């Protein structure tokens, strides 16, 4: 969405590649104009991409379709779990966007390849974006410059990043961060390394059916 707004403001870019993992609801939408959240949900190594409902898409629809149509589509999504935009609206979106979905395996391959070729350590989300970008360039036969927006630190996802680099994670967050730092020659971000010196404030694990009661409890305690 940020790339779209930048382009509208005059940034000279071509297509904006929307990358998805196995949860490919956006990839399907950008191809067909049909948004359908009634599908299986997958847990992947890029959890911030594990979605069935995209809030940014609603923002894009506002710019392309206007407020009234966006409200209509969101109402349909809430009530039926799906909606279909018009051919003209889809054409407008396709002028700027193309969607690609990549698997965990493709993301892991991107992490390994880029570290080998450029000594750069991708996180699992940026790896999906890199793999999607690579697919787009190969499909189009383009030799143009392509910018991949990196969204997170590999130190937040040490398990799958280490695995992609051919190393085994221990499951201990601190030890795995130190291992990743050692084998890649990169520094652990200060805010993450400082976590281990902080006091643990929240230890409760709450079942879903208890969430409302716990929220009321916390709110009540906060008023005292």
Stretch-by-stretch model annotation:
Residues 1-224:
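PLP-dependent amino-acid enzyme catalytic core
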């Amino acid at each position: 969405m940020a790339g779209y707004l930048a382009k509208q403001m005059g940034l000279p870019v071509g297509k904006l590649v929307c990358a998805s993992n196995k949860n490919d609801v956006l990839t399907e939408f950008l191809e067909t104009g049909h948004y359908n959240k009634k599908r299986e949900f997958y847990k992947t190594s890029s959890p911030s991409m594990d979605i069935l409902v995209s809030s940014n898409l609603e923002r894009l629809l506002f710019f392309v379709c206007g407020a009234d149509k966006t409200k209509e589509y969101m109402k349909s999504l809430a009530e039926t779990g799906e909606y279909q935009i018009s051919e003209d609206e889809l054409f407008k979106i396709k002028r700027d966007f193309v969607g690609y979905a990549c698997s965990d395996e493709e993301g892991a391959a991107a992490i390994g390849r880029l570290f080998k070729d450029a000594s750069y350590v991708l996180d699992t989300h940026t790896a999906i974006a890199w793999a999607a970008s690579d697919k787009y360039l190969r499909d189009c036969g383009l030799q143009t410059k392509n910018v991949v927006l990196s969204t997170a630190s590999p130190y937040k996802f040490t398990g799958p990043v280490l695995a992609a680099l051919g190393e085994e994670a221990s499951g201990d967050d601190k030890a795995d961060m130190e291992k990743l730092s050692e084998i890649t020659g990169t520094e652990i971000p200060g805010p993450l390394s400082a976590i281990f010196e902080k006091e643990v404030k929240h230890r409760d694990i709450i079942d879903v059916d208890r969430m409302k009661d716990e929220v009321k409890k916390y709110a009540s305690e906060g008023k005292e």
